[in-house]
Amino acid sequence: MRRLHATWTAAGTLLSVMAAGLSAQAAISLPRDFDAYVARTMKQFEVPGLAIAVVKDGKVVLAKGYGVRRLGDSARVDERTLFGIASNTKAFTATAIGILVEEGKLQWDAPVVNYLPWFQMYDPFVTRELTIRDLLVHRSGLGLGAGDLLWWPSSTYDRKEVARRLRYIKPATSFRSAYAYDNVLYSVAGEVIEAVSGQTWEDFVSSRILGKVGMTASSVRHSAAAGAGDVATPHAPIDGHVRPVAPFTSDNVNPAGGINAGAADIAKWMMVQLDSGRLGDGSQLFTPRTTRELWSVVTPFRVGNPPPELAALRTNFAGYALGFGLRDYRGWKIVSHTGGLPGFVSRLTLVPDQRLGIAVLTNQESVEAFEAITWRVLDHYLGAPPTDWISTFARLKARGDSITAAQERAAVTRRDSTSHPSLPLERYAGTYRDAWYGDVTIALEGGKLVLRFAHTPDLTGDLEHYQYDTFIARWRNRELRADAYVTFALKPDGSIDQVKMAAVSPATDFSFDFQDLLLVPAPAGPSR
């Protein structure tokens, strides 16, 4: 959902790792220095708090919290502390579909329009042919993150309207020809679940999955975390310093990323997945047939060579299944997914033939932290030679940060600072309309241009002249970290023909799909 993205001065607090574990005796199955390794990871990557779950052979080896829920506070993370697991929710949505298939209410390869007659994609052929399976495997022809601006940042569109507006989004590739990660089609899957079950996605997943698995502390709404007592605060690096950020609370895309969970509950979820749907009482949430569907690659990835530091992670195959990704590692099949929201990133990893599951939930946007911990645990159980994953991922992060900084500096040096806008500022003001998003307004206020997305309050920004007829939208909510170029194209008579946008920084989250907008002057009449 979000990108898998300063020194924290509270090192003493970080190093005094304290956790409430479910099974202290079972924890000896992990390396003896594991807690120290976690503490070192957290210090290196400035993570205030995280939770880890490890299951093996049907038993909980570890379900434990480390660090603090909020930077500067004393409340500790424990095994029940809730984290936004973001796109790790997608496996729950795919499992819900699998349950309904087993009940005969859905078919994996039936067209979506059989269940949602109102549903449309841009291409009528795709509308007719898009199946339930296609909703879950990122091969619809939509571009990366296409349509995410309909819900991110929090918008006034409800889930059905987000799905309805897909009909206006042009495809980036031909149908089923390429992988491009999306979120909006998982929301459509949520609409399908409601149509055939008579329950909202939230009610179905809560009663038919969380309740039966025993995930009693978990919730299915982004908005629910705010009212929970034992909940982690999201953090992110802002202007070089890690600090708390506002949680994402909109519920219009819950089927793609709305679940909040802690280590204890995620441990239960992993055990059910590893045991082909078998619950603690011996009953089946789903059957092995659904497991085979969930874990079979549908959309293959092109496999290349990783950076030299990650030579050990070279894979022979990789692809996307149903709510899970698959690859191999040292001869073992790995089933996994990651998740990202503002201030939260997580990773869930299963090794079916080892009956091993690992989950790392963090309250800081450090993909490097969960990677370093996950691969350390995998190496331990798979008998792999030791690798200093902390140093490895620290070097990769430093290199990536350096490349991004160089690209941002280059954009500044390329700017023609002697140029001026072609028109007086008031001539740029007006209402502009994109076919799938709707209206964006630009107004002259106090001698400066201000841009506002009509359905997204957080996308309000001051336009700063960059060069020629290009401005930069500096969003007033600086937590977005997504400033965007705004370029006006003029007609021969000097009037504005269209407006295009693009992210300024290459590190901008892909869900800010500004590049997909084509804004044209809106005709007189009601706004859209």
Question: Which positions does each model-derived feature cover?
Answer:
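Short glycine/proline-rich turn/loop motifs
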Residues: 73-77, 165-172, 245-252
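Catalytic nucleophile serine of serine hydrolases
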Residues: 87-89, 180-183
